[in-house]
């Protein structure tokens, strides 16, 4: 069963102790030196914000500041096997451009609330 996270209510079904579906296709997530699945787990564990993806195979972009101060983005595709219980990460990248600006603005708005 596959799942799409178009409905925000679906996020409540994620197993946050083991959030990712990883197989041979996405086992080598990082295209940037020094980034790996552990970095994606850091993003998931550090109060991420979610943004709808505009293009490509990802439905959502999970963004968070990780230990060390870097802001990383993990594109998420629908699960191939686990329905709504797992997210399927398809990369780990440093956040940049408009996405980084939106994340920093949204975090600032949260701290002002």
Q: Language-model segments: what does each one mean?
A:
Residues 1-113:
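Ribonuclease/tRNase effector modules and their secretory precursors
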């Amino acid at each position: 069963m596959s799942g799409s996270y178009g409905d925000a209510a679906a996020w409540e079904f994620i197993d946050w102790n083991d959030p990712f579906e990883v197989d041979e296709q996405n086992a080598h997530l990082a295209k940037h030196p020094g980034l790996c699945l552990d970095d994606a787990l850091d993003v998931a564990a550090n109060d991420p914000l979610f943004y709808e993806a505009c293009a490509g195979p990802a439905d959502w972009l999970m963004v968070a500041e990780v230990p060390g101060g870097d802001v990383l983005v993990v594109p998420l595709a629908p699960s191939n096997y686990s329905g709504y219980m797992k997210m399927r990460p398809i990369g780990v990248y440093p956040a940049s451009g408009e996405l980084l600006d939106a994340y920093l603005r949204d975090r600032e708005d949260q701290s002002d609330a």
